[in-house]
Amino acid sequence: MPDEVALIHQVGREHMPLADRSQVAYILLEASPTELMAQVRMPLNFALVLDHSGSMSKNQKLASVKEAVKMVIDHLSPADYISVVMFSGRANIIIPSMPARDPQGMKAAIERIKIGGGTNMARGMQAGLDELHRWSIPHAINRMILLTDGRTIASNKCRDLAKLAREFGIVIHPLGIGSDWDEGLLDEIGILSGGTEAEFIRTPTDAMSIFRQQVQSAMDVVVRNAILTLRLPIGVAPKRATRVLPTISDLGSSVLSDRQIVIPLGDLEKNNPPAVLIELLVEPRPAGLFRIAQAELSYDVPMIGLTGEKVRADIAVTFRSDAMQSSQLNPDVMNYVEKVNAHRLVSKVLDEYKRTGKTTTRLAPNVTRVLDSETQAALEQISQGQQISQEQVKVIGNKTRKLTQRLDYPG
């Protein structure tokens, strides 16, 4: 039995009531690298693709980003590779891809970066991909950090490049700084490349901590190409799949089929395992123990020569007539369910607001109670027909995606 990754599952209810109609069953699955993987460290192949258009001069944005890039350089080992590309109307390669063996020289090059003009992010992305391809680095974690503070021309080219990055195993992590960037485009770029939605750098002073998180995330990767598959028996149908950690994201219908759910998890980090929430529709069953899914995780650990390893788990519930037992819910699972429902409804409100400047969706108290006071206040303004700023829109979206990073329970 493989010991590199633990496939952990919990169900919303271990005991389900006998019923004459289909019922929803929730499954929470986590793919967690074990202690056996604690010492694994793969080389990094980083491309930092950064906006230095005129607007980056405001509020010390460029100055803060330059300091964050220097911090990244200091955190790398000589076995890691880094390149830095600045873009405005065109792309400039400040540091061509090379091992991080001369941190002082690299930081001096960063210090010399000046403000440019215009914003053509696609040119920066293309140059960044070229640098990531410059060397063949065995077992490297290929990452692009893409930062902008505004809107770009040639947005479709950016999407095409994100798809190309995924084909080559390069994950793009988009970062938006300030309040004027196109969150829809940056979110798409992240997802199309096999990553997640854009991270919001609310103030320039936040750049340091967010860049540090990005570096640590890459350093913590120990498992590659993880794919989670759930096979369902007759009488069980998939309803929805949602990533809940590290952030909330609806995985859409593309991962669902009649009797199977297939979710590409990608890289697994040793200190930040991903988790998904599965909703199933289970047809009526007689009393007894029934399997509702078989979960299988396949993965590679190239640093120790493992490919296509698999770990499996059978997931079962008991149907019974005892109303007391069948009413008992798993608080951890249901907390995730509550946060996912809140995220879904808040996202609907934001989508309506972006399209029409108002919303007809009303949020019930059981939704708003999991939101912080800033988010509640902004949503209340929208519900009353008032306008909120673009920064507030981005704050709400960013915070709501991260609701599951803390679990809390009603008192």
Regions found by a protein language model. Name each.
Residues 32-34, 231-233, 281-283, 300:
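Solvent-exposed residues in well-ordered beta-strands and their adjoining turns
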Residues 28-30, 278-279, 295-297:
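OB-fold and OB-like beta-barrel modules that bind single-stranded nucleic acids
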Residues 246-271:
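Extracellular adhesion/glycan-binding regions together with long Ser/Thr-
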Residues 282-411:
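Long, acidic serine/threonine- and proline-rich intrinsically disordered regions
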Residues 95, 234-243, 302-306:
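Short aromatic-acidic-glycine turn motif
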Residues 2, 8-225, 286-287, 369-374:
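Exposed acidic/Ser/Thr-rich ligand/metal-binding surfaces
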Residues 269-288:
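Low-complexity, intrinsically disordered segments enriched in Ser/Thr together with acidic residues
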